[in-house]
Amino acid sequence: MQVLSSLKTAKQRHRDCQIVRRRGKVYVICKSNPRFKARQR
Protein backbone atom coordinates (compact mmCIF):
# COMPACT_ATOMS: atom_id res chain seq x y z
CA MET A 1 0.00 0.00 0.00
CA GLN A 2 1.31 3.41 -0.97
CA VAL A 3 0.99 6.51 1.18
CA LEU A 4 0.31 9.49 -1.07
CA SER A 5 -0.38 13.16 -0.60
CA SER A 6 -2.89 13.26 -3.47
CA LEU A 7 -5.23 10.41 -4.32
CA LYS A 8 -6.57 11.88 -7.55
CA THR A 9 -3.89 10.21 -9.67
CA ALA A 10 -4.20 6.99 -7.67
CA LYS A 11 -7.90 6.79 -8.52
CA GLN A 12 -7.17 7.19 -12.24
CA ARG A 13 -4.68 4.31 -12.39
CA HIS A 14 -7.37 1.69 -12.90
CA ARG A 15 -11.05 1.94 -13.74
CA ASP A 16 -12.09 -0.23 -10.76
CA CYS A 17 -10.37 2.00 -8.20
CA GLN A 18 -12.67 3.74 -5.77
CA ILE A 19 -12.13 6.21 -2.94
CA VAL A 20 -13.30 5.17 0.54
CA ARG A 21 -13.12 7.03 3.86
CA ARG A 22 -12.42 4.87 6.92
CA ARG A 23 -11.51 6.02 10.45
CA GLY A 24 -10.66 9.53 9.28
CA LYS A 25 -8.25 8.37 6.58
CA VAL A 26 -8.93 8.34 2.85
CA TYR A 27 -8.16 5.12 0.98
CA VAL A 28 -8.16 4.01 -2.64
CA ILE A 29 -9.24 0.39 -2.94
CA CYS A 30 -9.17 -1.72 -6.08
CA LYS A 31 -10.78 -5.15 -5.92
CA SER A 32 -9.62 -6.43 -9.29
CA ASN A 33 -6.00 -5.25 -8.98
CA PRO A 34 -5.00 -4.85 -5.30
CA ARG A 35 -1.56 -3.45 -6.09
CA PHE A 36 -3.21 -0.07 -6.71
CA LYS A 37 -4.23 0.28 -3.05
CA ALA A 38 -3.26 3.62 -1.55
CA ARG A 39 -3.78 5.69 1.58
CA GLN A 40 -3.62 9.39 2.29
CA ARG A 41 -1.76 10.73 5.33
Swiss-Prot record:
Instruction: Quote the cellular component terms of the Gene Ontology held in the record.
Output: ribonucleoprotein complex; ribosome
Q: Which PANTHER family match?
A: 50S RIBOSOMAL PROTEIN L36 2, LARGE RIBOSOMAL SUBUNIT PROTEIN BL36B
The UniProt entry's GO biological process terms, in alphabetical order, are:
translation
Alphabetic keyword roster: Ribonucleoprotein, Ribosomal protein
Q: Which NCBIfam families match?
A: PRK00831.1, rpmJ_bact
**Record-given protein name:** Large ribosomal subunit protein bL36B
Phylogenetic placement of the source organism: Bacteria, Pseudomonadati, Pseudomonadota, Betaproteobacteria, Neisseriales
- Top-rank lineage group of the source organism: Bacteria
Q: Name one Pfam family in it.
A: Ribosomal_L36
Keyword set includes Lyase: no
According to the UniProt entry, its GO molecular function terms are: structural constituent of ribosome
Q: Per the similarity annotation, which family is this?
A: Belongs to the bacterial ribosomal protein bL36 family.
